[in-house]
Amino acid sequence: MPMSLRLHNNLTRRVEPFAPLDPSSPTLYVCGPTVYNYAHIGNARGPVVFDVLAALLRRRYGALRYARNITDVDDKINAAAQAQGVPISTITDRFAAIYRQDMAALGVVPPDIEPEATAHIPQIVAMIEQLIATGHAYAAEGHVLFSVSSFEDYGKLSRRDPDEMLAGARVDVAPYKRDPGDFVLWKPSSDDLPGWPSPWGRGRPGWHIECSAMAAAHLGPTIDIHAGGVDLQFPHHENEIAQSECAHGGATFARFWLHNGMLNFSGAKMSKSLGNIETVHELIARHPPEALRYALLSAHYRQPLDWSDGLIEQAKNTLDRLYGTLRDLAALEAESGSDLAVSMTIPAEVESALDDDLNTPLALSVMASIASDARALRSDLMQSGQASARMIELHAARAKLLGAGMALGLLQQDPAAWFSRGTDAGDDARITALVEERSAAKKAKDFARADAIRKQLAEEGIVLEDTPQGVRWKRA
């Protein structure tokens, strides 16, 4: 039997046994993307890691209510739409769809609930009204602000002193604020920006209140696990706690807080602001998506991960060995006349590794050991000629390796499909997807991206032809 699930709770800074409030329906909320551009590979670490957690919770409890939001109203979105001269929905619809496609390519199972901020304006307004009514927020010059001093536990997650928090939040010290640390719940909108009617005039919500309202609407006032990147711990998650607990009479907002570490690239944190990012979309065009998933799981989720081409290549080579093992085991079974259906069971050693605060590096190591044992068994059976006599043992070895992969979202394709990557059939689908993306980029007036795709295809010897039926491509 696997041990009980233990998770590092960033609220207490301790690894603690996890038990949901309602064992029949644990709840998980993960902060999702702001859809104004392509997600970079650092943005994918959380979805991949917490996909492993979601699968573990479903196995353990038989059910899960998992929400991951879409932020589709934000100043960055407004800026992107204005820069490209297109409606805001053109930006958000496009990049939300690309995000979903990219996550699917990485093997990330969609959440049960994917709330969008713009679909929850009534809930956001109602929460703000409750905060004003209880003295935790105030209206000023068309804005509504949360009064940080009204919540004595402010800072309990990040454990920063007030001066540190003020610096970290990068808040505007506007004249209408009662305290420099007060943050925006609602802001006025000019006619050229998205806005909704409210008791405080036409406006739009602040970022932090969106997650609080969406989490409460779908998961209730108290959720079991709230997860996201460590860069969101302050101010975003700190502010979520303040808003939510004040709006719900002091009820604990989230019982466990999980934060994944950042990706580093050439020794520096990967971020859009530093310009050192690699997008998921570009990477999955050049590499097997499963190798990217493996690489993202290769370090413990709370630790930084050094991202490099070498890491991806190492992941590819490891998957080559693992899929090669599965292929060879299946071939030996077939040669010996086996018609047993594979019944995957996740090995206890893998479950125990994941129960230890999602120790994916240990789980990957266990999977490698299982594969090594399976190869040794195959060699022994081939040399001794006992494959037929020990068919159940051989079959169990393959099922065990597949089960280990299933727990991590790996090894779920046919080995032949894995080894056919880069062939004309696989490449044709990739090129067609790039051509379609280029057409969508041109329609959205994202000419920089369209030109970049054309250049990439030209370097690969792909010629594009405009026809009345649309764009066609051929190899030069």
Swiss-Prot record:
Keyword list, A-Z: Aminoacyl-tRNA synthetase, ATP-binding, Cytoplasm, Ligase, Metal-binding, Nucleotide-binding, Protein biosynthesis, Zinc
One Gene Ontology molecular-function label: cysteine-tRNA ligase activity
Subcellular location: Cytoplasm
GO biological process, one term: cysteinyl-tRNA aminoacylation
Gene Ontology CC annotations of this record: cytosol
Pfam families on file: CysS_C, DALR_2, tRNA-synt_1e
UniProt cofactor note: Binds 1 zinc ion per subunit.
Alphabetized InterPro entries for the sequence: Cys-tRNA-ligase, Cys-tRNA-synt_Ia_DALR, Cys-tRNA/MSH_ligase, CysS_C, Rossmann-like_a/b/a_fold, tRNA-synt_1_cat_dom, tRNAsynth_Ia_anticodon-bd
Binding residues annotated for Zn(2+), in chain numbering: 31, 211, 236, 240
Catalytic activity as recorded in UniProt: tRNA(Cys) + L-cysteine + ATP = L-cysteinyl-tRNA(Cys) + AMP + diphosphate
Residues that hold ATP according to the record: 272
Cofactor dependence: Zn(2+)
Domain of life (superkingdom): Bacteria
PANTHER family, A to Z: CYSTEINE--TRNA LIGASE, CYTOPLASMIC, CYSTEINYL-TRNA SYNTHETASE
UniProt similarity note: Belongs to the class-I aminoacyl-tRNA synthetase family.
Protein name, per record: Cysteine--tRNA ligase
Species annotation: Xanthomonas euvesicatoria pv. vesicatoria (strain 85-10) (Xanthomonas campestris pv. vesicatoria)
